[in-house]
Protein backbone atom coordinates (compact mmCIF):
# COMPACT_ATOMS: atom_id res chain seq x y z
CA UNK A 1 0.00 0.00 0.00
CA UNK A 2 1.42 3.40 -0.95
CA UNK A 3 0.03 5.17 2.15
CA UNK A 4 1.64 5.27 5.57
CA UNK A 5 0.46 2.59 7.99
CA UNK A 6 0.26 2.88 11.78
CA UNK A 7 3.25 0.49 11.79
CA UNK A 8 5.33 3.21 10.10
CA UNK A 9 4.75 5.68 12.96
CA UNK A 10 6.73 6.22 16.17
CA UNK A 11 3.80 6.22 18.60
CA UNK A 12 5.50 6.22 22.00
CA UNK A 13 4.54 9.22 24.13
CA UNK A 14 2.72 10.82 21.18
CA UNK A 15 -0.88 12.04 21.28
CA UNK A 16 -2.52 10.03 18.49
CA UNK A 17 -5.97 10.95 17.12
CA UNK A 18 -7.60 7.78 15.79
CA UNK A 19 -10.78 7.99 13.71
CA UNK A 20 -12.72 4.78 14.30
CA UNK A 21 -16.18 3.51 13.35
CA UNK A 22 -18.10 3.00 16.58
CA UNK A 23 -21.46 3.55 14.86
CA UNK A 24 -23.02 0.66 16.81
CA UNK A 25 -26.68 -0.06 17.59
CA UNK A 26 -27.93 0.91 21.07
CA UNK A 27 -31.11 -0.30 22.80
CA UNK A 28 -33.65 2.03 24.45
CA UNK A 29 -31.59 1.92 27.67
CA UNK A 30 -28.49 3.07 25.78
CA UNK A 31 -26.73 -0.31 25.92
CA UNK A 32 -24.62 -1.54 22.99
CA UNK A 33 -26.51 -4.44 21.35
CA UNK A 34 -23.86 -5.41 18.77
CA UNK A 35 -20.19 -4.59 19.38
CA UNK A 36 -18.86 -6.00 16.07
CA UNK A 37 -17.54 -2.62 14.90
CA UNK A 38 -15.71 -2.04 18.17
CA UNK A 39 -14.19 -5.56 18.00
CA UNK A 40 -13.03 -5.03 14.41
CA UNK A 41 -10.89 -2.04 15.30
CA UNK A 42 -9.56 -3.47 18.62
CA UNK A 43 -6.31 -4.76 17.04
CA UNK A 44 -5.44 -1.19 15.94
CA UNK A 45 -6.36 0.28 19.35
CA UNK A 46 -4.35 -2.43 21.15
CA UNK A 47 -1.37 -1.89 18.82
CA UNK A 48 -1.35 1.86 19.58
CA UNK A 49 -1.68 1.39 23.36
CA UNK A 50 0.99 -1.34 23.50
CA UNK A 51 3.35 0.99 21.64
CA UNK A 52 2.89 3.74 24.21
CA UNK A 53 0.49 6.06 22.38
CA UNK A 54 -1.66 8.58 24.24
CA UNK A 55 -4.74 7.60 22.29
CA UNK A 56 -7.63 9.92 21.41
CA UNK A 57 -10.53 8.03 19.78
CA UNK A 58 -13.10 9.79 17.61
CA UNK A 59 -16.28 8.41 15.99
CA UNK A 60 -19.79 9.27 14.91
CA UNK A 61 -22.93 7.41 15.95
CA UNK A 62 -26.19 7.69 14.02
CA UNK A 63 -27.37 10.90 12.35
CA UNK A 64 -27.79 13.53 15.08
CA UNK A 65 -28.11 16.32 12.45
CA UNK A 66 -25.34 18.51 13.82
CA UNK A 67 -26.61 18.92 17.38
CA UNK A 68 -26.23 17.00 20.65
CA UNK A 69 -28.68 14.15 21.14
CA UNK A 70 -28.29 12.08 24.34
CA UNK A 71 -29.72 9.00 22.55
CA UNK A 72 -26.69 9.03 20.24
CA UNK A 73 -24.03 9.59 22.89
CA UNK A 74 -20.86 7.48 22.72
CA UNK A 75 -20.72 7.20 26.54
CA UNK A 76 -22.09 3.59 26.53
CA UNK A 77 -19.45 2.75 23.91
CA UNK A 78 -16.69 4.01 26.23
CA UNK A 79 -18.03 1.66 28.92
CA UNK A 80 -18.10 -1.32 26.52
CA UNK A 81 -14.61 -0.51 25.24
CA UNK A 82 -13.33 -0.38 28.84
CA UNK A 83 -14.55 -3.96 29.39
CA UNK A 84 -13.10 -5.18 26.08
CA UNK A 85 -9.68 -3.63 26.72
CA UNK A 86 -9.69 -5.02 30.27
CA UNK A 87 -9.77 -8.52 28.75
CA UNK A 88 -7.43 -7.74 25.88
CA UNK A 89 -4.67 -5.65 27.43
CA UNK A 90 -4.63 -5.35 31.20
CA UNK A 91 -7.15 -5.18 34.00
CA UNK A 92 -8.01 -1.62 34.98
CA UNK A 93 -7.20 -0.24 31.50
CA UNK A 94 -9.00 3.07 31.81
CA UNK A 95 -10.85 4.64 28.88
CA UNK A 96 -11.63 8.28 29.58
CA UNK A 97 -14.68 9.93 28.07
CA UNK A 98 -14.84 13.57 27.01
CA UNK A 99 -18.38 15.03 26.90
CA UNK A 100 -17.41 17.01 23.78
CA UNK A 101 -14.95 16.40 20.95
CA UNK A 102 -13.61 19.99 21.02
CA UNK A 103 -13.29 22.76 23.63
CA UNK A 104 -11.38 23.26 26.87
CA UNK A 105 -12.40 20.01 28.56
CA UNK A 106 -11.38 17.87 25.58
CA UNK A 107 -8.06 19.78 25.38
CA UNK A 108 -7.41 19.29 29.10
CA UNK A 109 -8.29 15.56 29.05
CA UNK A 110 -6.08 14.97 25.99
CA UNK A 111 -3.15 16.77 27.65
CA UNK A 112 -3.49 14.66 30.82
CA UNK A 113 -3.27 11.34 28.95
CA UNK A 114 -0.33 9.14 29.86
CA UNK A 115 1.42 6.53 27.71
CA UNK A 116 -0.90 3.59 26.99
CA UNK A 117 -4.08 5.45 28.00
CA UNK A 118 -7.14 6.10 25.82
CA UNK A 119 -9.75 8.86 25.66
CA UNK A 120 -12.99 8.55 23.67
CA UNK A 121 -14.45 11.85 22.45
CA UNK A 122 -18.19 12.44 22.29
CA UNK A 123 -20.00 11.93 18.94
CA UNK A 124 -18.23 14.12 16.37
CA UNK A 125 -21.50 14.59 14.45
CA UNK A 126 -22.96 16.58 17.37
CA UNK A 127 -21.27 19.43 15.46
CA UNK A 128 -22.67 20.34 12.03
CA UNK A 129 -19.14 21.43 11.01
CA UNK A 130 -18.03 17.76 10.91
CA UNK A 131 -20.04 16.81 7.82
CA UNK A 132 -19.37 20.21 6.21
CA UNK A 133 -15.62 19.53 6.54
CA UNK A 134 -15.24 22.96 8.15
CA UNK A 135 -11.52 23.91 8.26
CA UNK A 136 -11.71 25.72 11.64
CA UNK A 137 -13.41 22.68 13.20
CA UNK A 138 -10.87 20.30 11.61
CA UNK A 139 -8.06 22.48 13.00
CA UNK A 140 -9.61 22.29 16.48
CA UNK A 141 -9.72 18.47 16.29
CA UNK A 142 -6.10 18.45 15.10
CA UNK A 143 -5.02 20.64 18.04
CA UNK A 144 -5.69 17.65 20.33
CA UNK A 145 -2.96 15.51 18.75
CA UNK A 146 0.40 15.13 17.05
CA UNK A 147 -0.34 12.15 14.77
CA UNK A 148 -3.49 10.96 12.97
CA UNK A 149 -4.64 7.39 12.22
CA UNK A 150 -7.78 6.53 10.23
CA UNK A 151 -9.22 3.07 10.93
CA UNK A 152 -12.78 3.91 9.82
CA UNK A 153 -12.95 2.45 6.30
CA UNK A 154 -16.77 2.68 6.41
CA UNK A 155 -16.49 6.49 6.45
CA UNK A 156 -13.53 6.77 4.03
CA UNK A 157 -15.78 7.79 1.12
CA UNK A 158 -16.86 10.90 3.06
CA UNK A 159 -14.78 14.10 3.03
CA UNK A 160 -15.61 15.13 6.61
CA UNK A 161 -13.55 17.09 9.13
CA UNK A 162 -12.52 13.96 11.07
CA UNK A 163 -11.74 11.88 7.97
CA UNK A 164 -10.20 14.42 5.58
CA UNK A 165 -9.98 17.99 6.95
CA UNK A 166 -7.93 17.11 10.04
CA UNK A 167 -5.12 15.61 7.94
CA UNK A 168 -4.14 19.10 6.68
CA UNK A 169 -3.17 20.15 10.22
CA UNK A 170 -1.19 17.16 11.54
CA UNK A 171 2.39 16.09 10.94
CA UNK A 172 1.58 12.59 9.63
CA UNK A 173 -1.61 10.67 8.76
CA UNK A 174 -1.64 6.88 8.53
CA UNK A 175 -4.00 3.97 7.93
CA UNK A 176 -4.95 1.76 10.88
CA UNK A 177 -4.68 -2.04 10.65
CA UNK A 178 -8.34 -2.51 9.67
CA UNK A 179 -8.19 0.25 7.05
CA UNK A 180 -5.00 -1.27 5.64
CA UNK A 181 -6.58 -4.74 5.47
CA UNK A 182 -9.56 -3.32 3.52
CA UNK A 183 -7.31 -1.47 1.08
CA UNK A 184 -5.03 -4.49 0.60
CA UNK A 185 -7.87 -6.93 -0.19
CA UNK A 186 -9.97 -4.58 -2.31
CA UNK A 187 -6.86 -3.19 -4.01
CA UNK A 188 -5.61 -6.64 -5.03
CA UNK A 189 -9.08 -7.65 -6.27
CA UNK A 190 -9.34 -4.60 -8.52
CA UNK A 191 -5.73 -4.30 -9.69
CA UNK A 192 -4.17 -7.77 -9.65
CA UNK A 193 -6.79 -10.48 -9.06
CA UNK A 194 -6.18 -14.21 -9.33
CA UNK A 195 -8.24 -15.43 -12.31
CA UNK A 196 -10.99 -16.41 -12.97
CA UNK A 197 -12.46 -13.34 -11.25
CA UNK A 198 -16.22 -13.46 -10.59
CA UNK A 199 -18.28 -10.49 -9.35
CA UNK A 200 -21.69 -11.16 -7.78
CA UNK A 201 -23.91 -8.09 -7.60
CA UNK A 202 -27.38 -7.91 -6.11
CA UNK A 203 -29.75 -5.48 -4.47
CA UNK A 204 -32.80 -3.63 -5.63
CA UNK A 205 -31.53 -1.06 -8.11
CA UNK A 206 -29.30 -1.10 -11.17
CA UNK A 207 -28.73 2.63 -10.60
CA UNK A 208 -26.88 1.87 -7.31
CA UNK A 209 -24.43 -0.50 -9.02
CA UNK A 210 -23.96 0.96 -12.54
CA UNK A 211 -20.53 2.38 -11.73
CA UNK A 212 -19.40 -0.92 -10.22
CA UNK A 213 -20.66 -2.97 -13.19
CA UNK A 214 -18.98 -0.65 -15.70
CA UNK A 215 -15.67 -0.54 -13.82
CA UNK A 216 -15.53 -4.30 -13.15
CA UNK A 217 -16.44 -5.32 -16.71
CA UNK A 218 -12.88 -4.61 -17.79
CA UNK A 219 -11.44 -6.73 -14.96
CA UNK A 220 -13.69 -9.76 -14.36
CA UNK A 221 -14.32 -13.02 -16.22
CA UNK A 222 -17.96 -13.29 -15.16
CA UNK A 223 -20.62 -11.04 -13.65
CA UNK A 224 -23.52 -12.60 -11.76
CA UNK A 225 -26.59 -10.40 -11.26
CA UNK A 226 -29.34 -11.19 -8.76
CA UNK A 227 -31.86 -9.30 -6.66
CA UNK A 228 -34.32 -6.69 -7.92
CA UNK A 229 -31.75 -5.20 -10.28
CA UNK A 230 -31.72 -8.40 -12.39
CA UNK A 231 -35.26 -7.69 -13.60
CA UNK A 232 -34.27 -4.47 -15.35
CA UNK A 233 -31.83 -6.59 -17.40
CA UNK A 234 -34.39 -9.36 -18.03
CA UNK A 235 -36.95 -6.75 -19.13
CA UNK A 236 -34.29 -5.23 -21.43
CA UNK A 237 -33.94 -8.70 -23.02
CA UNK A 238 -37.69 -8.66 -23.72
CA UNK A 239 -38.68 -11.14 -21.00
CA UNK A 240 -42.03 -11.00 -19.20
CA UNK A 241 -41.32 -10.02 -15.60
CA UNK A 242 -44.87 -9.50 -14.25
CA UNK A 243 -45.01 -6.98 -11.42
CA UNK A 244 -41.31 -7.37 -10.60
CA UNK A 245 -39.30 -4.32 -9.69
CA UNK A 246 -37.50 -2.68 -12.61
CA UNK A 247 -36.18 0.75 -13.56
CA UNK A 248 -37.83 1.92 -16.78
CA UNK A 249 -35.34 4.78 -17.20
CA UNK A 250 -32.43 2.32 -17.09
CA UNK A 251 -33.62 -0.14 -19.78
CA UNK A 252 -31.47 1.41 -22.52
CA UNK A 253 -28.44 1.39 -20.28
CA UNK A 254 -29.12 -2.27 -19.36
CA UNK A 255 -29.25 -3.13 -23.10
CA UNK A 256 -25.96 -1.30 -23.63
CA UNK A 257 -24.29 -3.17 -20.72
CA UNK A 258 -25.54 -6.54 -22.07
CA UNK A 259 -24.21 -5.70 -25.55
CA UNK A 260 -20.89 -4.58 -24.11
CA UNK A 261 -20.56 -7.82 -22.10
CA UNK A 262 -21.30 -9.85 -25.24
CA UNK A 263 -18.69 -7.88 -27.21
CA UNK A 264 -16.06 -8.52 -24.52
CA UNK A 265 -16.90 -12.25 -24.41
CA UNK A 266 -17.77 -11.79 -20.76
CA UNK A 267 -20.15 -14.17 -18.98
CA UNK A 268 -23.11 -12.11 -17.76
CA UNK A 269 -25.36 -14.41 -15.75
CA UNK A 270 -28.98 -13.52 -14.90
CA UNK A 271 -31.67 -15.53 -13.08
CA UNK A 272 -33.23 -18.34 -15.18
CA UNK A 273 -35.97 -19.29 -12.70
CA UNK A 274 -37.66 -17.36 -9.93
CA UNK A 275 -39.47 -17.45 -6.61
CA UNK A 276 -42.42 -15.06 -6.85
CA UNK A 277 -45.36 -13.76 -4.82
CA UNK A 278 -48.48 -11.72 -5.54
CA UNK A 279 -47.41 -8.98 -3.12
CA UNK A 280 -44.34 -7.57 -1.38
CA UNK A 281 -45.03 -9.09 2.00
CA UNK A 282 -43.08 -11.35 4.36
CA UNK A 283 -46.13 -13.62 4.74
CA UNK A 284 -46.85 -13.87 0.99
CA UNK A 285 -47.01 -17.42 -0.41
CA UNK A 286 -43.91 -18.24 -2.51
CA UNK A 287 -44.45 -19.64 -6.06
CA UNK A 288 -41.82 -21.33 -8.21
CA UNK A 289 -41.56 -20.08 -11.81
CA UNK A 290 -39.53 -22.63 -13.77
CA UNK A 291 -36.83 -22.07 -16.38
CA UNK A 292 -38.23 -20.74 -19.65
CA UNK A 293 -41.56 -19.75 -18.05
CA UNK A 294 -42.76 -16.15 -18.01
CA UNK A 295 -43.55 -14.52 -14.69
CA UNK A 296 -47.38 -14.10 -14.63
CA UNK A 297 -48.71 -10.54 -14.80
CA UNK A 298 -49.97 -10.58 -11.19
CA UNK A 299 -46.73 -12.00 -9.70
CA UNK A 300 -43.44 -10.34 -8.70
CA UNK A 301 -40.05 -12.02 -8.36
CA UNK A 302 -38.68 -11.85 -4.81
CA UNK A 303 -35.87 -14.44 -4.96
CA UNK A 304 -33.85 -16.56 -7.38
CA UNK A 305 -35.00 -20.15 -8.03
CA UNK A 306 -33.08 -23.45 -7.56
CA UNK A 307 -31.87 -23.66 -11.21
CA UNK A 308 -30.40 -20.15 -10.85
CA UNK A 309 -28.73 -21.12 -7.58
CA UNK A 310 -27.14 -24.12 -9.37
CA UNK A 311 -26.07 -21.99 -12.38
CA UNK A 312 -24.54 -19.25 -10.20
CA UNK A 313 -22.92 -21.77 -7.82
CA UNK A 314 -21.24 -23.60 -10.72
CA UNK A 315 -19.64 -20.34 -11.89
CA UNK A 316 -18.63 -19.37 -8.33
CA UNK A 317 -16.92 -22.78 -7.88
CA UNK A 318 -14.55 -22.04 -10.81
CA UNK A 319 -13.40 -18.66 -9.43
CA UNK A 320 -10.07 -17.77 -7.83
CA UNK A 321 -11.27 -14.27 -6.84
CA UNK A 322 -14.85 -13.51 -5.77
CA UNK A 323 -16.35 -10.13 -4.90
CA UNK A 324 -19.94 -10.17 -3.64
CA UNK A 325 -22.06 -7.14 -2.85
CA UNK A 326 -25.86 -7.27 -2.53
CA UNK A 327 -28.55 -9.91 -1.87
CA UNK A 328 -30.13 -12.23 -4.45
CA UNK A 329 -33.67 -11.59 -3.21
CA UNK A 330 -35.68 -9.94 -0.45
CA UNK A 331 -33.34 -11.27 2.21
CA UNK A 332 -35.25 -9.67 5.09
CA UNK A 333 -38.28 -11.91 4.31
CA UNK A 334 -37.47 -15.46 5.42
CA UNK A 335 -39.55 -17.02 2.60
CA UNK A 336 -37.40 -15.19 0.04
CA UNK A 337 -33.95 -15.47 1.67
CA UNK A 338 -33.03 -18.97 0.43
CA UNK A 339 -31.26 -17.79 -2.72
CA UNK A 340 -29.03 -15.35 -0.85
CA UNK A 341 -28.16 -17.98 1.78
CA UNK A 342 -27.35 -20.55 -0.93
CA UNK A 343 -25.00 -18.09 -2.65
CA UNK A 344 -23.34 -17.36 0.72
CA UNK A 345 -22.66 -21.10 1.05
CA UNK A 346 -21.38 -21.34 -2.54
CA UNK A 347 -18.94 -18.45 -1.99
CA UNK A 348 -17.76 -19.91 1.33
CA UNK A 349 -17.50 -23.38 -0.21
CA UNK A 350 -14.83 -22.29 -2.69
CA UNK A 351 -11.82 -22.60 -0.39
CA UNK A 352 -9.36 -22.04 -3.24
CA UNK A 353 -10.61 -18.51 -3.91
CA UNK A 354 -10.03 -15.16 -2.26
CA UNK A 355 -13.56 -14.10 -1.32
CA UNK A 356 -14.54 -10.53 -0.41
CA UNK A 357 -18.06 -9.82 0.82
CA UNK A 358 -19.46 -6.33 1.41
CA UNK A 359 -22.82 -4.64 1.93
CA UNK A 360 -25.20 -5.17 4.85
CA UNK A 361 -27.39 -7.98 3.48
CA UNK A 362 -24.55 -10.00 1.96
CA UNK A 363 -22.59 -9.76 5.21
CA UNK A 364 -25.72 -10.71 7.20
CA UNK A 365 -26.25 -13.70 4.87
CA UNK A 366 -22.79 -15.18 5.47
CA UNK A 367 -23.29 -14.85 9.23
CA UNK A 368 -26.83 -16.21 8.94
CA UNK A 369 -25.61 -19.23 6.96
CA UNK A 370 -22.90 -19.83 9.58
CA UNK A 371 -20.06 -19.50 7.05
CA UNK A 372 -18.52 -16.12 7.97
CA UNK A 373 -15.28 -17.80 9.10
CA UNK A 374 -14.84 -19.29 5.60
CA UNK A 375 -14.91 -15.88 3.85
CA UNK A 376 -11.43 -14.42 3.24
CA UNK A 377 -12.45 -10.84 3.95
CA UNK A 378 -15.74 -9.33 5.16
CA UNK A 379 -15.68 -5.61 4.36
CA UNK A 380 -16.70 -3.17 7.06
CA UNK A 381 -17.74 -0.45 4.63
CA UNK A 382 -20.77 -0.89 2.37
CA UNK A 383 -20.74 2.49 0.59
CA UNK A 384 -16.97 2.85 0.77
CA UNK A 385 -16.31 -0.61 -0.71
CA UNK A 386 -18.79 0.09 -3.53
CA UNK A 387 -17.07 3.37 -4.40
CA UNK A 388 -13.69 1.61 -4.30
CA UNK A 389 -15.04 -1.06 -6.69
CA UNK A 390 -16.31 1.74 -8.94
CA UNK A 391 -12.73 2.94 -9.21
CA UNK A 392 -13.46 6.15 -7.32
CA UNK A 393 -10.87 7.77 -5.08
CA UNK A 394 -11.89 7.75 -1.40
CA UNK A 395 -11.24 11.13 0.29
CA UNK A 396 -10.36 9.51 3.63
CA UNK A 397 -7.69 7.39 1.92
CA UNK A 398 -6.36 10.05 -0.45
CA UNK A 399 -5.80 12.35 2.56
CA UNK A 400 -3.36 9.93 4.23
CA UNK A 401 0.38 10.61 4.00
CA UNK A 402 2.16 8.90 1.10
CA UNK A 403 4.98 6.50 1.98
UniProtKB/Swiss-Prot annotation:
Keywords: ATP-binding, Cytoplasm, Glycolysis, Kinase, Nucleotide-binding, Transferase. It catalyses: (2R)-3-phosphoglycerate + ATP = (2R)-3-phospho-glyceroyl phosphate + ADP. It is an enzyme of class 2 (transferase). GO terms for biological process: gluconeogenesis; glycolytic process. InterPro entries: Phosphoglycerate_kinase, Phosphoglycerate_kinase_CS, Phosphoglycerate_kinase_N, Phosphoglycerate_kinase_sf. Substrate binds at residues 21-23, 37, 60-63, 125, 158. ATP binds at residues 209, 332, 359-362. It is found in: Cytoplasm. Its main location: cytoplasm. Its EC number is 2.7.2.3. One of its GO terms (molecular function) is ATP binding. GO terms for cellular component: cytosol. The keyword Repressor does not apply. Pathway: Carbohydrate degradation; glycolysis; pyruvate from D-glyceraldehyde 3-phosphate: step 2/5. Monomer. Belongs to the phosphoglycerate kinase family. This is Phosphoglycerate kinase. It comes from Koribacter versatilis (strain Ellin345). The gene is pgk.
Amino acid sequence: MSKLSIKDLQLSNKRVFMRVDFNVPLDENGRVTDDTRIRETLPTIEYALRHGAKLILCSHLGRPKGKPNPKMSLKPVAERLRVMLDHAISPGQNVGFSPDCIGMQAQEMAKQLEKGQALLLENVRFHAEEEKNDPAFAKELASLCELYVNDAFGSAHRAHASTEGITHYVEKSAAGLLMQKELDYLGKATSNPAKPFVAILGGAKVSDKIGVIQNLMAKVDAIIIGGGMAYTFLKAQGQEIGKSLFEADKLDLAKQILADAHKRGLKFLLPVDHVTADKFDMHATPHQIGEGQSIPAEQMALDIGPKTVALFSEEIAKARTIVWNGPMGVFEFDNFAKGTRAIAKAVAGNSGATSIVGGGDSVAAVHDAGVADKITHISTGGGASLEFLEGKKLPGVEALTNK
